[in-house]
Amino acid sequence: MSKTHLTEQKFSDFALHPLVVEALENKGFQYCTPIQALALPLTLSGRDVAGQAQTGTGKTLAFLASTFHYLLSHPAEEGRQTNQPRALIMAPTRELAVQIHSDAESLSQVTGLKLGLAYGGDGYDKQLKVLESGVDILIGTTGRLIDYAKQNYINLGAIQVVVLDEADRMYDLGFIKDIRWLFRRMPSVDKRLNMLFSATLSYRVRELAFEQMNNAEYVEVEPLQKTGHRIKEELFYPSNEEKMRLLQTLIEEEWPDRCIIFANTKHRCEEIWGHLAADGHRVGLLTGDVAQKKRLRILEDFTKGDLDILVATDVAARGLHIPLVTHVFNYDLPDDCEDYVHRIGRTGRAGESGHSISLACEEYALNLPAIETYTGHSIPVSKYNSDALLTDLPAPKRLARTRTGNGPRRNSAPRRSGAPRNNRKRPG
């Protein structure tokens, strides 16, 4: 983690529970990021917090440290039942819930607080078995949580801490009724610690959220700069006919160590995957049609470096912390301005630099003015030579529905020109 990403505030300087500090230091966390330095003094004093910060700035660790500290410092309610978790962390997607659970495991191991995970798609009985043994902190998506609550597999009457992560997306996806249903089954707002964290918190979201919070304090980091200053942004204007060849040429020239390509529809993602897989790239596909187990496996392979390229719809854009993503390609400019911020926020995380390349084609170029108005700046435009685009490209692969979305290992496919890697970089 780059030192420029951190403050001089140490976790050990706060009155955090010693076991929480130990768990953080075991993972190499000594100094706070700005959002952690702002939020922790408030949560440690029992204040509710709505935190806004760009992606990759440590929001997850801020609410996890607060949650574990609060539960260790405040005894469970006397007479608490096995099916009553003490803390509830809600996320908008299965992938984000799984990631939060993974981030919390090191704290769980040191503190002894038990974790539970609840999300739709699969694993119903496996998740239920963990819940039946009793958990302190339950992390999940609203649909599965309501399912378990209606069947009395969980009871929210002993909740001491509640967290909404990526709160804007929770509301945007229409989960507000689900959230309110869950809140109505918890103790009143003044009897629990409430936290909201997100990269974007509109006034509408804060107004709705504060209905469920107790005089929450609003904290923000770099509120006027919606895109990370370590991210180099670049824009091309291709024709529809040249768009795919431009993408493949840019990938060949940049040769990114790890990149995510976003498109607006699953069919477009499948098309991109087919071209890149045929060209010998190690590429994974992440859309809503991919089975849950396969989605998690693809994310794991991408995180470990077994895949170099991930082609995804916005299902993967929110909240996922995948380290060392060097490039993000917006094959389609998104219809939602906030999605642009979240997409390019996959790179340039934790103090590292990143590169975002967007293609403003004939179909989606009309989305650009709203995006630039929202971010507060124009995206630098680069030109390309149509005659220099790759032409020796194989026919795209057809997606095999019963197979994983991976191409051959990249190092088994010879580079097109055989030129040294450093000589393939574009100038500037």
UniProtKB/Swiss-Prot annotation:
Gene3D superfamilies: P-loop containing nucleotide triphosphate hydrolases. Belongs to the DEAD box helicase family. RhlB subfamily. This is ATP-dependent RNA helicase RhlB. Its main location: cytoplasm. A motif (Q motif) lies at residues 9-37. NCBIfam families: PRK04837.1 (NF003419). ATP binds at residues 53-60. It is an enzyme of class 3 (hydrolase). It catalyses: ATP + H2O = ADP + phosphate + H(+). Component of the RNA degradosome, which is a multiprotein complex involved in RNA processing and mRNA degradation. Keywords: ATP-binding, Cytoplasm, Helicase, Hydrolase, Nucleotide-binding, RNA-binding. GO terms for biological process: RNA catabolic process. A motif (DEAD box) lies at residues 165-168. It is found in: Cytoplasm. Its EC number is 3.6.4.13. DEAD-box RNA helicase involved in RNA degradation. Has RNA-dependent ATPase activity and unwinds double-stranded RNA. SUPFAM superfamilies: P-loop containing nucleoside triphosphate hydrolases. GO terms for molecular function: ATP binding; ATP hydrolysis activity; RNA binding; RNA helicase activity. Residues 40-219 form the Helicase ATP-binding domain. Residues 394-428 are annotated as: Disordered.
